[in-house]
């Protein structure tokens, strides 16, 4: 293929066109594929590429459009659905809102009705049934419900109640009482209406629900009453005129009556006009079912003596859960009643339980089916139906009974309404006439009824049926006139319809309520089924019998019960034959209404009867005028039929129920009946036979019945069966058995209803109250919750406050002990010496120490910082407050110190440098607080004292011997004075091992604090290198400040301050706490010391050997190593000082530390730098030195004891023999152990000799201070040791002796002062503290100040191998001498010394500042550090020191080291040996030697001489300083 197509044509090649592939593409499957792909047309034409692409584009476009449409449709559907849902939601919300509004309105109406409690009372009316009695009731009945529920005018078509204008006039006594009944019934119905959630139904709704009143005692207030179609409004009483124009209204009622029988109860066309006002139909059937408990077939003797059985009836109302509709205990043959809650459309399903066991089930289409009464379960059934009231047939029953056939509509109106009226009147007259004949019969029947026994004779029923048939036939024969009347009525206009409605209805009502035959006692006032309504509609004859006032419903119901559907058919036939449908239609609604009314207001039966009678008379008079014989048969037949039905109903009811009280009631009723008959006869005789119609007789009879009913009521009042609000089983039975008129039972029932209503109202009231209470309770719990929350919040706040307070407690209490724990903890966590983590370890160690002193609690730290800030920057008042709080916390938390120490130590190990800063701040705060609390001196004095101390350092700095002695003395003080400090030293050494650089940093800090120059020099060099300018400025300022401060400080002030301190110390809880801590610490230290001493004894020889070797190594080693050794020593010492409150006073350390931290923002850097220095210079040696130091310290603890013992001897050797005595002491104590220490001690002794004047004093003072501290520590630890120390001190100097004799608290004060308490209130003490604290501050600044210092120190160490050691010694000596001098000044309170010191300090500072010599540089370094500690600017110190000349420092230090002491010992080796001695024994061994040296030093040369010697030393050092360019560091 390729050969037939050149390569150039390959691009245009189309395989479809290739003839070689034609066969392939002609394949059906392939063609189908090509066609589907759009490459060819259906005809087989090959599409060009352009067409193909176009088609594909179109196809894609179509696809896209389809997708878009689909998506649009989808979204549209979603939107529509969403909108639909929103609409549904809105509708639901609207409905809910309407219901809520209706409920509120109903509640309002209910409240208004509740005000009319007399109307609703369950007892019969108390007042007379006269105009006076009912006038108010009428007003209430009409005004309150109408005003609240019927805003429409009275004449509105929907308002079926008579307007107020139609109220009967009081002049008509026969009619007066009727409105009362009406009003009462209306008020009741309005109440029921409101309860039934029809608050705005108006009067029509009231009328609709009136029939449910008789049953309301068993109805739930939340359930809608049954709305039955046959319930009509009650007409008003007849107008006083007595005229009735009925033609107007017959047509409308006829129209209203004829409606589909299948229409549901609540949707009847009769109420279409007002349907908008009644939104809901009844949810339940609400049929009142009366049943009888027939009893068990088998009775066991073991049954409970209570013969009653527990009956429960459950109904499945809507196909779901069963409801208990009845529960009670019944005797056999006892009836009970309950309300069916069947939902429309669901079957009527009942389950019967007897004593907890299910005995029967019933499931039928509706309640109406059982209206005739039947026994459930056959012959052996336990239950039977007595009657079913207010039941409406379901569709099935309607169809089965043929009730679905609509009645024939009336003919069109006739043209002449007058003829209609005449015909109607004639027909009514005939009815009346015929009634005259029927009434006697009826009376007889009623009498028979009353005497009816429990057995019902079938013959009577047959007779009644026959009579009914006869009456129907007669009515049929005379139906045409009735039809004409009906037609006339239909043609009649509506102008008088409204009023006449009520008038005629009133008339009917009277007759009905009396004649109705009380037949359905339980049916009374209870709506009857639509079937009955239909029957009424279908029986025009009966309905035309309106005048007879029979309750057609009751009558029909009776017929239904007796005859069933046959009667309904009969009625239909009658309807076809009769034409009086209009009359019947009118009569039926009104009769039903009147019946309802009579049922409701039965308590006023007499009134009703009288009203009915009067109405009848008036109507009879009217009718008699127009009476025509041809129309009489129809009413007569109807009345007969109705009477017969009533009789039958009553008999049937009576038959089904046992009547235990028949006789008494029968007698009463018989008597009443006889009386009534007599009265009727009289009435007939009085009136003409024409006018006296059967109605009158019936009225009289009803009257009589009512009277008898009243009597029966009186008798019945005590009957047990009458249970108000309960199920009236017995009363119904009694009434039925007696055949008593319905009025009788209705009175009771209405009373029960009233009671029920009252109870309902009460329940509602209580419910409302409960609601309110519940709401209030809901609110109350909210308030309570809020209160609780507030309380909790307050508690939490208080707790926080407490925590804040407690935090300070923790922060300040365990200062003394915590350092030990922290150190021990650090000791346990030994870390190899070379770890770079050393800086962090140092930070941690320092943090531990500070945490131990200041607490690790961040709150405590914050408080400490606040306290620091207060002490430095804020008013002393706040400081005092803070201090007081902190001190109090400190004192209070002594018991927690141990635990807190451990915790703080653990936390301290993990603390960051930030925590260290915070700790430093805490310490400073603590120290400042202590200082303030002790002396009341502001913390600012600390800076001054530190400045002074730095000046003193400068003054004394030039003197190496003094420095060496100072080291010795300080170390001796440390070692001898604080065996707990030994532990701390050891711990710190361990810490040093853990973090060699930490140890070094601490060493630097603590060496400086104790006068050890090495770390100070390194740190100073570092600072000098990086912060020359600032150092110079700050140093100058600091020096000037210090000079000024010193000038200001007077000896007397010093004395006063010291005295004040001494006086305050015992008072201050802090000090007590400190002393206690010291005691605890020393106790612990003693325990540890014993172990350590043993270890030291074992390791002593090794330590000596190591010390010698180390001394040699260090002598050979670069000054970095020496610095590290010194650092190691210093950290130990510093740790001792800082940890042991006896020596350094936590507060002083804290204070010095805090200013250092604050002054030295580069603390972390310094730590790192120092770490680097130590790593570079002598990490290994440091570790070794630390090990050696540790051993040395262990040995020192034992040597210290020896030194203490020997110290007594040496003390007596004389103060001037200090150089000799000191070496002697030192050699005596550790000589056998460490020869190098002996050399170091000799060097120290020589140094002391060279500085005998000044350093003798300085160290005498410092030594005394240290001795005192030692004594204090030892005294606390070991009384013997304390004694020895005191003896030594006494030997050394009487003043020292006196000072030593001061209480331990004073010693602790001095210790704290010597530590460099920023709080130094005694300014001499302040100097001493600055001496100690200054050095320590330098060390701390070396730690904190920094990164710069560390870097610079690293470089310096490399460069300053030899000179650095000497320089550090010099610095340390200066610091120590300075601190010694400060301490001596503080101790002895020598005004001269203070003044001289101030002057000498000024001179030295000035000389140092002017000369810029090497030694002055070193001195200034010390001063600078001290100044930094006091002023808080390490940078300035560094710069000034560097400006002064690091080279000279190095050289001068080298020379100083070479010079060693005034004796000419300038050998670095000797100095290094001395250093080694210090490093190994210094803390333990040197302490006794230094004590001895101090004992010799107490000689008090003038401070001026000391200063001069210092100056000479400085000059000599500067002259002898060999500044090699290698040592120079830019």
Curated annotation (Swiss-Prot):
One Pfam family recorded for the sequence: DUF4590
Keywords: Cell projection, Cytoplasm
Gene Ontology annotations for the cellular component aspect, listed alphabetically: cytoplasm; non-motile cilium
InterPro entries found in the cross-reference section: DUF4590, ERICH3
Stretches assigned to coiled coil: none
Comp. bias (Low complexity): 581-592, 834-845, 1213-1225
Cytoplasm is among the record's keywords: yes
Residue segments, region Disordered: 165-187, 408-429, 475-661, 673-724, 773-870, 923-1146, 1167-1334, 1360-1383, 1425-1530
Compartments (UniProt record): Cell projection, Cilium; Cytoplasm
Composition skew (Acidic residues), residue ranges: 563-574, 638-647, 943-958, 1289-1300
TM ranges: none
Basic and acidic residues: bias regions: 415-429, 531-545, 552-562, 600-616, 684-717, 773-787, 979-992, 1039-1116, 1173-1212, 1464-1487, 1502-1511
Comp. bias (Polar residues): 1517-1530
Domain of life: Eukaryota
GO BP terms: cilium assembly
Tissue: Expressed in dopaminergic and serotoninergic neurons.
Main function: Component of the primary cilium that controls cilium formation and length. May function within retrograde intraflagellar transport (IFT)-associated pathways to remove signaling proteins from primary cilia. Also involved in neuronal vesicle biogenesis and neurotransmitter vesicular function.
Subunit structure: Interacts with CLTC/clathrin heavy chain 1, AP2A2/AP-2 complex subunit alpha-2, and PIK3C2A/phosphatidylinositol 4-phosphate 3-kinase C2 domain-containing subunit alpha.
Protein name, entry field: Glutamate-rich protein 3
């Amino acid at each position: 293929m390729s050969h037939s197509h050149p390569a150039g044509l390959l691009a245009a090649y189309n395989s479809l066109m290739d003839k070689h592939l034609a066969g392939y593409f002609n394949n059906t499957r392939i063609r189908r594929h090509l066609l589907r792909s759009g490459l060819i047309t259906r005809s087989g034409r090959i599409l060009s590429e352009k067409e193909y692409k176009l088609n594909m584009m179109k196809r894609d476009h179509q696809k896209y459009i389809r997708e878009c449409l689909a998506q649009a449709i989808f979204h549209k559907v979603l939107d529509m659905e969403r909108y639909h849902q929103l609409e549904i939601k809105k509708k639901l919300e609207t409905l809910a809102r309407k219901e809520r509004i209706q409920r509120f309105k109903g509640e309002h109406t209910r409240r208004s009705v509740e005000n009319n409690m007399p109307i609703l009372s369950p007892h019969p009316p108390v007042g007379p049934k006269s105009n006076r009695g009912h006038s108010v009731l009428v007003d209430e009945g009409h005004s309150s419900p109408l005003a609240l529920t019927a805003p429409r005018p009275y004449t509105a078509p929907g308002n079926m109640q008579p307007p107020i204008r139609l109220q009967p006039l009081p002049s008509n006594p026969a009619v007066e009482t009727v409105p009362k009944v009406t009003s009462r019934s209306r008020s009741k119905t309005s109440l029921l209406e409101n309860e039934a959630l029809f608050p705005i139904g108006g009067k029509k709704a009231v009328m609709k629900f009136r029939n449910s009143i008789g049953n309301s005692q068993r109805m739930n207030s939340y359930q809608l009453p049954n709305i039955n179609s046959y319930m009509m409004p009650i007409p008003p009483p007849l107008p006083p005129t007595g005229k009735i124009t009925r033609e107007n209204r017959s047509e409308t009622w006829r129209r209203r009556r004829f409606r589909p029988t299948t229409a549901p109860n609540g949707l009847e066309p009769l109420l279409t006009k007002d349907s908008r006002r009644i939104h809901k139909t009844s949810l339940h059937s609400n049929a009142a079912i009366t049943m009888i408990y027939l009893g068990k077939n088998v009775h066991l003797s073991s049954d409970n003596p209570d013969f009653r059985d527990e009956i429960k009836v459950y109904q499945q109302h809507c196909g779901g859960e069963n409801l208990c509709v009845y529960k009670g205990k019944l005797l056999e043959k006892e009836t009970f009643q309950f309300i069916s809650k069947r939902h429309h459309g669901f079957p009527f399903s009942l389950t019967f339980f007897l004593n907890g066991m299910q005995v029967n089930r019933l499931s039928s289409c509706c309640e109406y089916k059982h209206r005739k009464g039947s026994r459930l379960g056959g012959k052996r059934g336990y239950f039977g139906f007595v009657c079913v009231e207010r039941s409406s047939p379901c569709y099935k029953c309607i169809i089965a009974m043929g009730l679905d056939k609509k009645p024939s509509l009336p003919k069109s109106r006739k043209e002449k309404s007058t003829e209609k009226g005449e015909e109607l009147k004639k027909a009514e007259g005939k009815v009346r006439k015929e009634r005259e004949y029927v009434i006697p019969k009826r009376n007889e029947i009623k009498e028979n009824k009353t005497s009816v026994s429990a057995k019902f004779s079938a013959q009577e029923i047959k007779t009644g049926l026959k009579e009914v048939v006869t009456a129907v036939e007669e009515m049929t024969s005379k139906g045409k006139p009735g039809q004409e009347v009906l037609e006339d009525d239909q043609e009649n206009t509506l102008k008088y319809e409204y009023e006449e409605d009520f008038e005629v209805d009133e008339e009917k009502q009277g007759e009905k309520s009396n004649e109705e035959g009380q037949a359905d006692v339980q049916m009374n006032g209870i709506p009857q089924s639509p079937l009955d309504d239909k029957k009424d509609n279908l029986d025009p004859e009966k309905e035309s019998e309106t005048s007879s006032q029979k309750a057609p419903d009751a009558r029909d119901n009776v017929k239904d019960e007796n005859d069933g559907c046959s009667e309904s058919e009969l009625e239909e036939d009658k309807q076809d034959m009769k034409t009086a449908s209009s009359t019947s239609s009118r009569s039926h609604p009104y009769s039903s209404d009147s019946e309802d009314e009579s049922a409701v207001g039965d308590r006023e039966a007499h009134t009703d009867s009288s009203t009915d009678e009067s109405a009848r008379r008036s109507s009879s008079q009217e009718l008699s005028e127009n009476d025509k014989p041809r129309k009489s048969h129809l009413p007569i037949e109807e009345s007969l039929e109705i009477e017969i039905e009533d009789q039958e109903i009553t008999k049937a009811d009576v038959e089904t129920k046992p009547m235990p009280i028949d006789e008494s009631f029968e007698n009463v009723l018989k008597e009443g009946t006889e009386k009534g008959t007599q009265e009727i006869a009289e009435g007939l005789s009085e009136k003409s036979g024409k006018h006296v119609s059967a109605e009158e007789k019936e009225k009289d009879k009803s009257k009589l019945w009512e009277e008898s009913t009243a009597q029966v009521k009186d008798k019945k009042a005590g009957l047990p069966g009458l249970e108000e609000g309960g199920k009236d089983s017995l009363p119904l039975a009694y009434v039925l058995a007696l055949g008593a008129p319905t009025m009788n039972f209705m009175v009771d029932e209405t009373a029960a209803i009233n009671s029920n209503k009252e109870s309902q109202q009460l329940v509602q009231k209580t419910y409302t109250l409960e609601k309110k209470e519940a709401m209030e309770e809901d609110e109350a719990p909210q308030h309570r919750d809020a209160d609780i929350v507030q309380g909790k919040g307050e508690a939490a706040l208080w707790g926080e406050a407490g925590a804040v307070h407690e935090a300070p407690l923790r922060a300040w209490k365990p200062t003394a002990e915590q350092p030990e724990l922290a150190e021990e903890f650090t000791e346990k966590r030994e870390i190899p010496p070379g770890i770079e983590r050393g800086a962090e370890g140092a930070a941690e160690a320092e943090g531990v120490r500070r945490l131990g002193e200041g607490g690790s609690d961040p709150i405590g730290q914050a408080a400490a910082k606040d306290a620091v800030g207060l002490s430095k920057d804020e008013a002393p008042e706040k400081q005092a407050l803070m201090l007081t709080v902190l001190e109090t916390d400190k004192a209070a938390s002594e018991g927690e110190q141990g635990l807190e120490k451990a915790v703080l130590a653990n936390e301290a190990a993990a603390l960051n440098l930030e925590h260290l800063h915070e700790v430093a701040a805490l310490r400073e705060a603590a120290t400042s607080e202590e200082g303030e609390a002790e002396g009341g001196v502001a913390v600012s004095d600390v800076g001054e004292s530190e400045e002074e101390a730095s000046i003193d350092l400068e003054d004394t700095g030039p003197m190496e011997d003094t420095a060496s002695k100072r080291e010795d003395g300080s170390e001796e003080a440390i070692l001898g004075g604080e065996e707990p400090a030994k532990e701390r030293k050891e711990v710190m050494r361990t810490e040093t091992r853990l973090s060699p650089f930490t140890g070094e940093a601490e060493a630097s800090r603590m060496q400086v604090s104790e006068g050890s120059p090495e770390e100070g020099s390194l740190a100073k060099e570092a600072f000098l290198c990086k912060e020359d300018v600032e150092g110079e400025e700050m140093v100058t300022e600091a020096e000037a400040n210090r000079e000024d401060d010193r000038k200001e400080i007077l000896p007397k002030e010093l004395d006063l301050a010291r005295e004040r301190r001494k006086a305050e110390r015992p008072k201050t809880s802090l000090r007590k706490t400190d002393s206690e801590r010291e005691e605890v610490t020393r106790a612990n230290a003693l325990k540890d010391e014993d172990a350590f001493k043993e270890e030291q004894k074992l390791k002593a020889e090794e330590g000596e050997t190591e010390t010698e070797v180390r001394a040699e190594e260090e002598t050979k080693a670069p000054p970095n190593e020496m610095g590290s050794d010194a650092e190691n020593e210093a950290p130990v010492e510093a740790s001792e000082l800082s940890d042991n409150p006896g020596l350094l006073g936590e507060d002083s350390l804290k204070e010095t530390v805090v200013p250092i931290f604050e002054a030295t923002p580069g603390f972390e850097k310094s730590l790192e730098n120092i770490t680097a220095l130590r790593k570079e210079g002598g990490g290994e040696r440091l570790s070794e030195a630390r090990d050696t130091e540790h051993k040395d310290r262990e040995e020192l603890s034992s040597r210290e004891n020896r030194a203490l013992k020997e110290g007594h001897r040496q003390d007596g050797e004389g103060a001037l023999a200090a150089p000799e005595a000191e070496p002697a002491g030192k050699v005596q104590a550790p000589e056998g152990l460490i020869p190098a220490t002996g050399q170091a001690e000799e060097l120290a002794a020589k140094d002391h000799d060279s500085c005998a004047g000044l350093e003798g004093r300085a160290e005498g003072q410092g030594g005394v201070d240290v001795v005192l501290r030692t004594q204090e520590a030892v005294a606390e630890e070991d009384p013997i040791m304390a004694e020895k120390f005191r003896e030594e001190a006494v030997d050394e100097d009487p003043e020292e002796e006196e000072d030593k004799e001061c209480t331990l608290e004073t010693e602790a004060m001095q210790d704290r002062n010597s530590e460099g308490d920023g709080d130094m209130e005694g300014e001499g003490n302040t100097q001493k503290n600055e001496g100690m604290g200054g050095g320590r501050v330098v060390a701390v600044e070396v730690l904190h100040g920094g990164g710069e210092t560390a870097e610079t120190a690293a470089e310096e160490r490399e460069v300053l191998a030899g000179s650095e050691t000497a320089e550090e010694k010099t610095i340390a000596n200066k610091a120590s001498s300075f601190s010694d001098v400060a301490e001596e000044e503080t101790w002895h309170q020598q005004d001269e010394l203070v003044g001289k010191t101030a002057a000498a300090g000024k001179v030295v500072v000035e000389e140092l500042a002017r000369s810029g010599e090497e030694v002055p540089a070193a001195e200034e370094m010390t001063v600078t550090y001290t100044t930094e500690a006091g002023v808080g600017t390490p940078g300035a110190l560094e710069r000034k020191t560097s400006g002064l000349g690091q080279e000279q420092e190095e050289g001068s230090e080298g020379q100083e080291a070479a010079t060693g002491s005034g004796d000419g010992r300038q050998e670095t080796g000797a100095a290094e040996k001395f250093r080694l001695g210090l490093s190994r024994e210094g803390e333990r061994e040197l302490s006794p030697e230094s004590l001895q040296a101090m004992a010799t030093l107490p000689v008090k040369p003038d401070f001026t001489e000391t200063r001069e010697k210092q100056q000479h030393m400085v000059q000599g050092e500067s002259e002898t300083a060999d500044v090699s360019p290698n040592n120079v560091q830019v």
